[in-house]
UniProtKB/Swiss-Prot annotation:
Residues 224-261 are annotated as: Disordered. It comes from Macaca mulata papillomavirus 1. GO terms for cellular component: host cell nucleus. One of its GO terms (biological process) is viral DNA genome replication. This is Regulatory protein E2.
Amino acid sequence: MMEALAERLSALQDRILELYEADSKDLKDQIEHWKCVRQECAVLYKAREVGFSHLNHQVVPSLTVSRAKAHKAIEVQLALESLQNSEYNNEEWTLQDASLEMWHTEPKGCFKKTGVPVTVLFDCDKDNTMEYVLWGHIYVWGDNGWVKTFGEADNWGLHYTVAGEKVYYVQFYEDAKKYGHGNGNGDGYEWEVHVGGTVMHYSDSVSSATHCDKLPTVEIVSGLQHINPSPPPANPSAKENVWSSPAKRVRRSDSGGDPVRALDGKSRSVLCGSAHNNATGSSGDSDYTPIVHLKGESNCLKCLRFRLGKHKHLYINISSTWRWANHASEKAIVTVTFANELQRQQFLNTVKIPSTVTLSQGVMTV
């Protein structure tokens, strides 16, 4: 039985990685992806049920974990299959559009596309900010099936309208109570909303959501052509694709020093710490080793790590999947270490990284 389960698991994981690498925009392929994920969970569940702790050198998760992952896969698969029967089935649907992370991003239980960042300054303080995502296209399940609408922003929050009903998926007042100071009596909060080239200000004793009908609104329609984009951030640590992440808290810095700068997947230089390159391509300090962080969905990274076993001569060590404990994102990370930067460059030139995986470079102490 172990051999049969191992062969089935290997075939499913190979197919999943093929779908990641193909980066298809066909809804049928996204449905197939989630079918494979569901079947993978079923194989792992069966393996654990009969007492196997490892399969294909992979740790078999507990029954509870496999069951929970299968339920999530079924949820997304059924939603996509119902979308396949709608008028929106011929639109472009990427793996990211159909990902579990996107499904659980606010507004939850909806499909979203074409997001832009919205920055809110609580107390109108640039050091006390929160970032949100305003979606250009939102697909909402209603009484008559899927309905496509668009996101809107006003001083009160982010919302969409379906069947004449305005639905807020972010209310700034709720976060103002958490992060703002107000007047100390539970009101008197103020904030600024920055979206595209528009700035909206709110300052009042906020006590009722009825205020929102009186506030100006910014609409995001058809690829955001109604808003002039903001200039790119000067801070090199800022992410370009802010819209693809859930809202993230930006806290005040306790020190005046610059943070360690993250590198994007296109960067080929090390900007982290005090390590410098010498003529041999090695780190100037023997205590530092070049690394690559691979960030993406846990299942994709596990399949990729399995494939990287064929390229062991191109790296020194590779970690298991891990996550930041205090990070809101569900994305997992795999870290790869190298003997020197020349080996890392050979790795980058040889290994094909799926487009759904984010690659960043840096160094770490050893």
